[in-house]
Amino acid sequence: MMRKRTFALIILLLTISFPAYAESLLTTDALKASYEELTLPGKERMGMVELGIMHDFTDNISLGFGSWMAVKGERGGFITIGLDGGLHYPVTEVIDLDTGLSVGAGGGRGGYTLSGGGLMLRTYAGLRYNMGSWGWLGAGVSYVDFPNGGAIHSTQPFLTYTLPFTSFIENGWGKSQQSLGDKQYNRLSPKVHSLELVTRKLFMASTSRTDTGGEQGDLTILGIEWRTYLGDNWYAKLETEGAAGGSAGYMQILAGAGYRIALTDKLFADTDLSLGAGGGGGVDSGGGLLLNGSAGMQYFLTPHFFAALSAAHLKATGGSFQANTLAFKLGYQTGVHTPESAGLAPACMQIRVANQTYQQASDLWRSHHANKSIENLGLQIDYFIKPDWYITGQAFAAYQGDAGAYMTGLVGPGFRKNFYGNFYLNAEALAGAAGGGGLAMGSGVVWQGNAGVGYEITPSLSALATLGRMEAVNGDFKANVKGLSLAWKFKANEHSNKAFQ
C-alpha cells in the first residue's frame, strides 16, 4: 500500500508539471538551498540543509530534485534524496507565495528505528522575495514526516534561497525547430559541463576516531562529480561519493566552486573549495558538516574524454573526522567548441524517476528482516554520447522494507535502441558504492546489471520496466531487482565555449 501511495505522489508531481510545459525559446532553472531544524524524539534537534535544482515548467509550477543532509546536531550522515515540486503565486511585484511538496527517501545515524522504511514527505508554505539578479530569498513553515514506521514527525520554520539561470531546453531529441535571436542568445547562461567517475583514497589523521571512540582507519570512496563551467575559468561543482572500503555506509555530498587554467591545449590545472555533509559507517563526523579544499590536474585524451588527479584536505567541523585525500578521475566534457558549431552545442539528456524492488537472493543478504523485500526510490541522469549509448549516474534510497538509511550510488554505460514502433530495448552495466539499512554490503563495492523494455508515450516522455541483478563484491548481499521508471527526454542547447578546444 505504501509503495502505491508513494508512486501515486510521484505521478502527481509529474503530471502536474509535464502537461503544463509549454515549449518556449528560453526556460528558467534555479539552484536551491534551504535550511531547517527538525525535532527528533527526546527533543533532540537536527539541522538539515537542502541542495537541489529546479526547472520552471510554467511561470507558477516548478519541479526538480535534491538532497537533504544533516549538518548540525549528532546525526552526521543522515541524508535523503528525492523529488521536489513547487507552486508559486505572485502577491506583489516582488513577493510570491511559495508552496510545495517533496517526496524522498533515506536516513542514517539511527537506522530504521529513526527513519523507518525511509520514506520522507515534506510539505511547506511561505513567502519569497525577489532580489532581482541576486535571486529569491524566502522563509516559511514546513512539516516533515517519515510515515513508513519512522519516528520523525516535525513542524519547523525554514529559510530558502534560489538562484535562477536561463537555459534553452527543448522536449525530445528531434531536430530543433527554434532559433534564438541575439538578445535571447545573450541571456542564455553559458554552460560547459563535465561528468567524472571518481575513486578517492582518504588517509585519516591520527586524531580521527570512530563514533565509538576507536581509531578510524583509512577509507576508499567511489562516486561522481559534476561540473558546470560559468565562463572560461570559473566552475561550480557537485560531487557525491560512498565508501567502497574501510567504513561501509559512509557517504558524502559536497558542493562548491573552483577555478581552472589551461597549461597547454590538453593539460589544465584547477583548484576548488566546497562544503557539504557526510557521515555514516561509524565515522565521527559530528553534526555532518564537511569542508573540502582541493587542487588537481586534468589531461584530455580526446576532445571530450579526460583523466585527472587531485589532492585535497577534508574535515568535519563538528567531529574528529579529518583526512588528506588523493583522487583519480575519468571524465567526459560537453560543449566542446568546433569550427562547425554555430554557438550552440545540443546535449541529449534524460532524467528518470525510478522505483526498484530488491528481492532476496541470498540467505544472509541483510542483518534483519531478511524475509522482506526492499523498495527504493531513485533518480537516474543519462547523458547520451551517441544516439544509442549513454553514461548514467544513479542514486537510490530505501523507503519501504525496514531498511531506512540504505543508499547507493551507481555509474556506468547504458544502451537504448528502438526496435518496434515506440518500443525500445534498454540495458545497463553499473558499479558503485552502497551501504546502510542493515544490508550485508561488505566493503561497500557493488555491481548491478539491468535490462528491460520501454515505451515512448510522447517524444519526450517514456516508461521503462527492467529486470536485473545486484551483488556486493565482497559481501553476502545478493538481490534480484525489478525496476519501473518514468523518463523525461530533452535537449539542452548550450553555449560552446571557445576556451575548450
Regions found by a protein language model. Give the residues of each.
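Transmembrane beta-strand segments of Gram-negative outer membrane beta-barrel proteins
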Residues: E23-E37, I61-F65, L97-T99, N186-A205, ...
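Solvent-exposed loop/turn segments connecting transmembrane beta-strands
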Residues: L38-G47, A70-T80, V91, R109-L119, ...
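Residues on the lipid-exposed face of transmembrane beta-strands in outer-membrane beta-barrel proteins
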Residues: Y35, L51-H55, L83-Y89, A125-Y129, ...
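Transmembrane beta-strands of outer-membrane beta-barrel pores
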Residues: Y35-P41, S67-G73, V103-R109, V141-P147, ...
